Amino acid sequence: VRMIMQTIQMYDVLEIEKKKEPGIVLTTNIPYVPTDERNLVYKAAKMLMDEFDIKEGLTMNLEKFIPVAAGMAGGSSDAAAAFVGVNRLFGLGLSEEELMKRAVKVGADVPYCVMRGTALAEGIGEKLTRLPRVPYCYVLVGKPGVNVSTKTAYENLKLDDPAVVHPDIDGMVTAVRNGDLDGMISRMGNVFEPGIISKYPVIQEIKDLMESNGAHKAMMSGSGPTVFGIFDDKEKMDRAAAVLRESRLAK
């Protein structure tokens, strides 16, 4: 892959506490989210505890607000928080780079979620080049009532489809470095869109709604189905958010 990644002000909350008894106890506010080794938070914490032979146990509570299976790296962000939290809690002294090397074993997006900010991601997503902050803008996020797995997104990926808009990554990098918001937006694209939108037309409806209500551009995030719209004005974004809520196309 080759893509630009950017953190936004949307987050889950992970609370971590030591306990005398060995083992990891993970709880969450979402009933269908697993709380064993299938959960990336559990997997990340266990990896560090096994490596450093930590005898104490952990109690972790995960309050999820980022939608599940939404193409927003929510699970990867949670795993990154577990790496950072366990490192601090037990005073392991691992640097950010050392955490990132371990994080890729849990998931391709996890090293970026440890680093955060604006970055060019290559390889499977683990080769990261830090970039200057994206030019200041407002981002509206809407998730329709469907879930799309990464596996489904890749199964429906047709790179030779004329409808596929290939992003100009080099042009985006230059625009970001120059603080050129319009230049960045004009070079954006998501190759997953045609395959996913053909299965879930509501994604296109959300894009159209955002763009007809002031977004410079609306696009699917990652493998979808979440859509984000970029605005240069908060009032425009707030009005678009109200219209989106009324439409009930997305949350």
Give the residues covered by each predicted segment.
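ATP-binding N-lobe of GHMP and related small-molecule kinases
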Residues: 1-70, 88, 92-97, 134, ...
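Short, basic/glycine-rich phosphate-binding loops at helix/coil junctions
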Residues: 20-34, 82, 178-188
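Glycine/serine-rich anion-binding loops at beta->alpha junctions
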Residues: 61-90, 108, 216-231
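Solvent-exposed alpha-helices and their adjacent loops that cap or buttress functional pockets
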Residues: 6-7, 104-105, 111-114, 130-135, ...
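Conserved short beta-strand edge segments in small beta-sheet-based binding/regulatory domains
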Residues: 248-251
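Conserved, helical-rich catalytic subdomain that frames metal- and/or nucleotide-binding sites
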Residues: 115, 120-217, 232-235, 242-246
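Contiguous, small/hydrophobic- and glycine-enriched helical/loop subdomains that border
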Residues: 57, 83-120
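Residue-level signal for inorganic ion chemistry
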Residues: 14-16, 41, 75, 109, ...
